Amino acid sequence: MNQLEIFGFRAMWSPYLFCILLGITALYLYFYRRMSSKPNRITGKEMVCFLSAMLFLYAAEGSPVDLLGHIMFSAHMVQMAVLYLVVPPLLIAGIPAWLWEKIIFRPSIKPVFSFFTTPLIALLLFNGIFSLYHVPLIFDTVKTDPFYHTLITWLIFVLAFFMWWPLVHKVERLRQLSGLMKLGYIMADGMLLTPACALIMFSGAPLYATYTDPALWAEAMRLCVPADMMGQVPLTGPEMLNTLPLLEDQQLGAVMMKIIQEIVYGTFLAVIFFQWVKKEREKDGQEEPPYIQQTIS
């Protein structure tokens, strides 16, 4: 952490993003308190999910993790895992269903939203674009261009939102996946993400020039370090701040991505499985003839 201080406070803590997220959070809490006595209130569970989403979003994009992600590939993969696997489901769960209905059911939004949240399309788009992003040529291009970097980051985030929507949303007017379908959906999602991680994990050499070439690395650092600070820092290459060998750092990144993915997906699998079992038992109990229920009691 002390080594990162050479890049300055703005690069480490992104105060502008902090202020934006703080303002959004304050607005959310204002409506939470104002609507506490109304039927369409924001529940305590929704508030916790939303606040957690803001916290994880800042941790991924505003804390030193963002700066470290330009220095170490392993930190980059942790950042991606949090941004795309942790924040979207918390954000969906943190906004009440009635508010989602007001947003989604607008005539200009509903057809597009319905298409991109179709389970198969959402799965293929998120995992496909995420995998393409980590093709070395594309990755190095995006990492050194501010426009492409912003575009791809937002694109994958939106696709991650679409991917999580069928699993998490509580909008009754929209189709709900059954418990069994949700279990299959998560397992398919995990399988589709595996090839990209395996390619990185089992590569015999460093894949990304933005972590090996000092000139490209310095160019990539300009995306997160203010221009006035870049001129004051004597940059020699990523090895000045990364003590891990490049190949080991790359392999560690793929492993960290899979570990976080397994934790998140495993948690959802457990929750969905027990919810499904509970519903099936309740359903079976309702369908049993009266004399069977009397016999059991």
UniProtKB/Swiss-Prot annotation:
Keywords of this entry: Cell membrane, Membrane, Transmembrane, Transmembrane helix
InterPro entries, alphabetized: Caa3-assmbl_CtaG (IPR014108), Caa3_assmbl_CtaG-rel (IPR019108)
Compartments where located: Cell membrane
Gene Ontology CC: plasma membrane
Broad class of where this protein is predominantly found: membrane
Domain of life: Bacteria
Mode of membrane association: Multi-pass membrane protein
Keyword Cell membrane: yes
The keyword Magnesium is assigned to this record: no
Transmembrane parts of this sequence: 11-31, 48-68, 80-100, 119-139, 147-167, 183-203, 254-274
Protein name per the record: Protein CtaG
Source organism per UniProt: Bacillus subtilis (strain 168)
